[in-house]
């Protein structure tokens, strides 16, 4: 399992590029870009090196944490998966590539694609500072076009990118993502109701083509959650001093909400029997947890303290864990 925090070398390389820039200006740039994303915009608002560095300083730690948590769930479900090649689609500053490099020592080939020149330049500069990623190839252009001529990869990741596409583009791109996948496709989106709906649409579409769910779902049936409920997870990460300064934040940590789906060509070898869908409640009486279960149902289960083995396990559960249900 890998840490949700940026590797020390990546953190230092990113902060070195921020050195000498006005923190106030960088914070304002990051704020404008984030506001554009929240209102439905895309990376087109990132037009310069200064924009890319400011945005990466503020958002790269959180997106890295979400991808890392998703990869951890994948590794739990499929511990023998040892990809040799990665395709990072909508790669931005290379966040998912760095997370995958931490997760899989087997990776030897890294390819990325994105339509934003400023983010590509930053990714290539950061990759040059990282031994594992120095051979990164990074194509510039629309994902849908580039995917048609991309090499297949053992691991394909699309993190925080399908939400930037129109509905028609999204369906075609999701099909193309799976077509380029030899082993596992991981899609990560913001943990909002809209992000969850995009994940569910991709899940349903790709299951229908024969893909297998590795994580987070312990089953391939329809999602049992009913609106206004939705499946999402939370990953806590540490904020660096630069991160806090640019966000104007005092709290030394951040909680990133995300939704994801990991789909495989072959069934996962150790998919857990249940997934914890919210932070469990532990009291003097026992533990209560909301679980998505292998039979395709979701339920709140109670584990009494008197059931010592089951309670000992349940009291250690966290939101997002794959567990053995009582």
Regions found by a protein language model. Name each.
Residues 1-42:
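N-terminal auxiliary segments of SAM/dcSAM-dependent transferases
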Residues 45-69:
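Class I SAM-dependent methyltransferase Rossmann-like catalytic core
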Residues 82-92:
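Conserved class I S-adenosyl-L-methionine
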Residues 93-106:
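Conserved SAM-binding loop of SAM-dependent methyltransferases across substrates and taxa
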Residues 116:
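Conserved SAM/SAH-binding beta-strand->alpha-helix loop
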Residues 154-168:
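A short SAM/SAH-binding and catalytic strip from SAM-dependent methyltransferases
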Residues 182-190:
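Conserved beta-strand signature within the Rossmann-like core of class I S-adenosyl-L-methionine
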Residues 245-326:
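C-terminal lobe and adjacent flexible extensions of AdoMet/dcAdoMet transferase-like proteins
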